[in-house]
Regions:
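Extended redox/cofactor-interaction regions of prokaryotic respiratory oxidoreductases
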Residues: 1-63, 73-83, 91, 159-257
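Long, contiguous, secondary-structure-rich segments that constitute the structural scaffold
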Residues: 97-159, 230-248, 252-350
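Catalytic, metal-anchored helix/loop core of enzyme active sites in primary metabolism
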Residues: 66
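Glycine/threonine-rich phosphate-binding loop and adjacent beta-strand/alpha-helix elements that clamp
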Residues: 75-102, 112, 117
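Electropositive
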Residues: 71-72, 282
Length: 350
């Protein structure tokens, strides 16, 4: 398969012609909140021919789905961590069994994806290949078991499951260059694609800081430890305490604009505008403002996240511009967005 930067998704949906996206499968995601120009993507999703979501939440994105297929909850399925092992400083293994039996009519997310794939194959009048049939019958537990047996655990899931606290296999050990699949067993750091960008980097550095109009500020994002992703806002324990939704602004920048701490302000960029509460903070550099990721759940009709919709705040990605991308990967630029700040709600667009 292949992939494209999500910053192109809105245009791929809205641009007519061959290859236009008319259907979408969303799996445990909320791109309306998490991608540049989220308000434009929100409008584009409403024009799809069909959308299906595998999700436990009706959020800003899945509210557009024709069908929502909720998988089992996190305590109804077994778990072996993969992502956070990439951040580990020691070699560990831990198998977490399901705490509760899943209801008879419930399916795990991998089962939902499998059954959708089978249904699509049959709808095309085709039959699954022998390879596909074999893959579809293998549950994640069997895959993890096989990988553990060829690794340092040498005992599979059954051995790891006997140790609820996990197994510490000691400090990390280098596996290079053996794991490299290149003919020379070396990593080519001078590939033509990044090197072409490096050649132009000096030109960008010579330009100096981003040129701003006299009344413009630079917007940057931030994430908090307890609610760093949008879906965590639906957990009261993770959002309790001091409010964290505000736009942080240096006191001098507020004073220049006749704004005081706690005021509602209008923030406008080249691609959108929002209204949000501001907070004076000397932690911010003059000329820079900061808004946290993932807020603004209450601004969209149809969002059914009981706690999240009660939280104040606005989405930073209603201000980011999907046309501003990094040259090599084409991923969106999420920081350093020029914005203007004014008291009160926004006026009509310029």
């Amino acid at each position: 398969g292949s992939e494209l930067p999500v910053s192109t998704l809105t245009d791929e949906i809205l641009t007519p012609g061959e290859g236009q996206i008319r259907g979408l499968v969303s799996i445990a995601g909320n791109p309306v909140s998490s991608t540049p120009g989220g308000h434009r993507l929100d409008e584009a999703l409403g024009g799809l021919d069909f959308m299906v979501a595998i999700d436990i939440y009706v959020n800003e994105t899945t509210r557009h789905a024709d069908v929502i297929l909720p998988p089992t909850g996190p305590l109804e399925r077994e778990h072996y961590d993969l992502i956070f092992h990439t951040l580990a400083v020691r070699n560990t293994a831990r198998w977490s069994p399901a705490l509760f039996e899943k209801p008879d009519d419930a399916r795990h997310d991998w089962e939902v994806a499998r059954d959708l794939a089978l249904a699509l194959i049959r709808a095309r009048g085709e039959k699954p290949s022998v390879v596909d049939q074999g893959r579809f019958r293998v549950p994640p537990r069997m895959i993890v078991d096989g990988l553990l047996r060829v690794g340092p655990v040498r005992g599979g899931v059954k051995k790891v499951a006997k140790r609820p606290g996990g197994i510490d296999l000691g400090p990390l050990e280098s596996v290079l260059p053996d794991r490299l699949q290149t003919p020379t067993k070396r990593i080519d750091l001078a590939h033509e694609v990044p090197m072409s960008a490096v050649a132009e980097l000096a030109d960008h550095l010579d330009v100096g800081p981003i040129r701003l109009a006299p009344d413009e500020l630079l917007l940057i994002g931030r994430r908090h430890q307890r609610d760093n992703n949008s879906w965590l806002h639906n957990a009261p324990r993770l959002t309790k305490g001091r409010a964290r939704h505000q736009l942080l602004v240096h006191p001098d920048d507020l004073a220049k604009r006749g704004i005081v701490d706690g005021d509602e302000v209008s923030v406008r960029s080249a691609s959108g505008q929002i209204v949000v509460e501001c907070a004076a903070s000397e932690d911010m550099m003059r000329g820079v403002v900061s808004l946290p990721h993932g807020y603004g759940h209450g601004r969209k009709a149809g969002v059914r996240m009981r706690h999240a919709v009660t939280l104040p705040g606005a989405s930073i990605n209603d201000l980011t511009d999907p046309s501003r991308t990094e040259q090599v990967s084409a991923n969106g630029v999420l920081n350093g967005v020029p914005v203007t700040l004014a008291p009160g709600p926004p006026g009509p667009p310029a």
